């Protein structure tokens, strides 16, 4: 059974447990609500695609608390994107990072040229940044079934996913 919780220390600990167990959590962002999981857990990523009925060719982004987390994920932000990121992040800007050989993310996509890439975002929301600082980077997509309107409220996210998502943070 799913639960809807206000963001606090207890609900963040619960979310960390859900994420560590390969589950899905809905979180608020600076734009819409998102469904999120561990970006290193292939089964959890598959679950996002399944509950959204999302085509696999549509990549997931990775939400970060700061661009300082890129190096630890095995990602590089090439020039001039690194300068643009410094100017526009946090915010609704999603640059494409290049994955190094040491990248462990299961969300990385290959370009037709064979380059491995990952869209990243640092949300401009104190609440979302608090969540990301507690849980770490998250693979995410908008909280809606593919083709439907994105959830603007936690109630809309619950309506979209019901018990397919273990925890809803608001």
Q: Can you annotate each of these PLM segments?
A:
Residues 1-170:
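Active-site-adjacent structural elements in enzyme catalytic cores
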